[in-house]
From Swiss-Prot:
This is Uridylate kinase. It is an enzyme of class 2 (transferase). It catalyses: UMP + ATP = UDP + ADP. It comes from Aster yellows witches'-broom phytoplasma (strain AYWB). Inhibited by UTP. SUPFAM superfamilies: Carbamate kinase-like. ATP binds at residues 10-13, 53, 57, 161, 167, 170. Keywords: ATP-binding, Cytoplasm, Kinase, Nucleotide-binding, Pyrimidine biosynthesis, Transferase. Pathway: Pyrimidine metabolism; CTP biosynthesis via de novo pathway; UDP from UMP (UMPK route): step 1/1. Homohexamer. One of its GO terms (biological process) is 'de novo' CTP biosynthetic process. The gene is pyrH. InterPro entries: AceGlu_kinase-like_sf (IPR036393), Asp/Glu/Uridylate_kinase (IPR001048), Uridylate_kinase (IPR011817), Uridylate_kinase_bac (IPR015963).
């Protein structure tokens, strides 16, 4: 069976809220957990980074007049909350997990240590990485690219909330937006397509990390992407078309 053997799954915080406007939807997070278990049972080694858009948005901090660093740390704490919720949902499926955070939260998680994270993956534990990169001004997309490079993972599965992949323009604003099936990292950078921030895209380019952008809300899509079935979403790589 041809499939990705080792992945970093980047979940947007919004993917956890389902159809709700805020927070964590119990049915949605359970569905995600079972889909992760399904690919775990195929022998795939899995690291996960979760965003916090379901709990905290940077623009809220701006509206409050908050210091950018303070607002970013709130976002990092939100990712830890999401990581713990996902850990619990996964463990209800009898999937062994470890939550590791970029700064110490010793009562609830392990500190992120690269060699220890690699060891967890080798022992077939799902590693959930909280607190982003651990520093303000760096997005969870950048954290995903950084951790993928550190953990020798050559593909990031970027799960989106009801977005099929990368478009030539915003599909929410333009009905004639076209889904791009395959694109180069260089094009993401030069065209400034709204897939991820420039720092994350540059890291992936420099370290030959492919990115697969797909719709998380369609049941079975994670497995299809891992097994390279169905031509789902958008592939971003150094090879292009």
């Amino acid at each position: 069976m041809w499939m990705h053997k080792k992945i970093l799954l980047k979940l947007s915080g919004e993917s956890l809220k389902g159809d709700s406007s805020y927070g964590i939807d119990p049915r949605t997070i359970k569905k995600i957990a079972w889909e992760i278990k399904e690919i775990k049972d195929l022998g795939v080694k899995i690291a996960i980074i979760v965003g916090a858009g379901n709990l905290w948005r940077g623009r809220t901090g701006e509206e409050l007049g908050m210091d950018r660093s303070q607002a970013d740390y709130m976002g990092m704490l939100g990712t830890i909350m999401n990581s713990l919720a996902l850990q619990d949902a996964l463990e209800q499926t009898n999937t062994i997990t470890r939550v590791m955070t970029a700064f110490p939260v010793s009562s609830v998680a392990e500190p992120y240590i690269r060699r220890k994270a690699i060891r967890h993956l080798e022992k077939d534990r799902v590693v959930i990485l909280g607190a982003g990169a651990g520093s303000p001004y760096f997005s969870t997309d950048t954290a995903a690219a950084l951790r993928a490079a550190e953990l020798n993972i050559d593909v990031i599965l970027m799960a989106k909330n009801n977005i099929e992949g990368v478009y030539n323009k915003d599909p929410k604003k333009y009905q004639d937006a076209v889904l791009i099936k395959h694109i180069k990292h260089q094009q993401i950078l030069s065209q400034r397509l709204a897939v991820m921030d420039i720092t994350a895209a540059s890291l992936c380019l420099e370290n030959n990390i492919d990115i697969l952008v797909f719709n998380m809300l369609k049941k079975g899509n994670i497995k299809k992407v891992v097994l390279k079935e169905g031509n789902i979403g958008t592939v971003i790589s150094s090879k292009g078309e």
